[in-house]
């Protein structure tokens, strides 16, 4: 007998496992708001070298992220972009909370070249450029985000 695809316990466990893995790849650490996590991932490049800067992000996520872009600008400047006209997000056009930077900024793109199960052994190459960017913005967390920013960036949707 062949098990039914969608009622098989093995298939169900596999599906749930895959969904859990996919969800965890995009999850933020629980101690941060989405705006705080955005700042850690895309603004606060703690080192001029990707391998060192990515260690901070990877330690929170407990894995080596494949790629990441750091905008060499301030959080306040990105918050200002949230005031630009809203547009559909290129990565998900059903969302209309994205905003185009309007000006190019210097950025560093980090690309994983040496993956490892040990986070400290992951190595990255970096590419610098000046590009426009598109961010998704949402209302801030009234308790944990800075009160001067009612709307904050929560996702770097695209660099162009």
UniProtKB/Swiss-Prot annotation:
Alphabetical keyword list: Disulfide bond, Endonuclease, Glycoprotein, Hydrolase, Lyase, Lysosome, Nitration, Nuclease, Signal
GO CC, any one term: extracellular space
Catalytic activity: an [RNA] containing cytidine + H2O = an [RNA]-3'-cytidine-3'-phosphate + a 5'-hydroxy-ribonucleotide-3'-[RNA]; an [RNA] containing uridine + H2O = an [RNA]-3'-uridine-3'-phosphate + a 5'-hydroxy-ribonucleotide-3'-[RNA]
Residues the record marks as active site: 42 (proton acceptor), 155 (proton donor)
Binding-site positions, substrate: 65-69
Signal peptide residues on this chain, from the entry's feature table: 1-27
Principal location listed in the UniProt entry: other
Gene3D superfamilies noted in UniProt: Ribonuclease A-like domain
Residues carrying covalently attached carbohydrate according to the record: 34, 44, 92, 111, 138
Nuclease as UniProt keyword: yes
Sites bearing 3'-nitrotyrosine, chain numbering: 60
CDD domains for the chain: RNase_A_canonical
Cell location: Lysosome; Cytoplasmic granule
EC number: 4.6.1.18
Enzyme class: lyase
Single GO BP term: defense response to virus
GO molecular function, one term: nucleic acid binding
Disulfide topology: 50-110, 64-122, 82-137, 89-98
PROSITE patterns, per database record: RNASE_PANCREATIC
Alphabetized InterPro entries for the sequence: RNaseA (IPR001427), RNaseA-like_dom_sf (IPR036816), RNaseA_AS (IPR023411), RNaseA_domain (IPR023412)
Family: Belongs to the pancreatic ribonuclease family.
Protein function: This is a non-secretory ribonuclease. It is a pyrimidine specific nuclease with a slight preference for U. Cytotoxin and helminthotoxin. Possesses a wide variety of biological activities.
Subunit note: Interacts with and forms a tight 1:1 complex with RNH1. Dimerization of two such complexes may occur.
Protein's UniProt name: Non-secretory ribonuclease
Organism in which the protein naturally occurs: Papio hamadryas
Lineage: Eukaryota, Metazoa, Chordata, Craniata, Vertebrata
């Amino acid at each position: 007998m062949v098990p039914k695809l969608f009622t098989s316990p093995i298939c169900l466990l596999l599906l749930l496992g895959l969904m859990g893995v996919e969800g965890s790849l995009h999850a933020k650490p629980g101690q941060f708001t989405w705006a705080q996590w955005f700042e850690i991932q895309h603004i606060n490049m703690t080192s001029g070298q990707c391998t060192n800067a990515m260690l901070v992000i990877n330690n929170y996520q407990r894995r080596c992220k494949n790629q990441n872009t750091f905008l060499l600008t301030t959080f306040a400047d990105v918050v200002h972009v949230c005031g630009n006209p809203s547009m559909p997000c290129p990565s998900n056009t059903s969302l209309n909370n994205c905003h185009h930077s309007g000006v190019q900024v210097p950025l560093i793109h980090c690309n994983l070249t040496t993956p490892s199960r040990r986070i400290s052994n992951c190595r990255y190459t970096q590419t610098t450029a000046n590009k426009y960017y598109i961010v998704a913005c949402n209302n801030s967390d009234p308790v944990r985000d800075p009160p001067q920013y009612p709307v904050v960036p929560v996702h770097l949707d695209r660099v162009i």
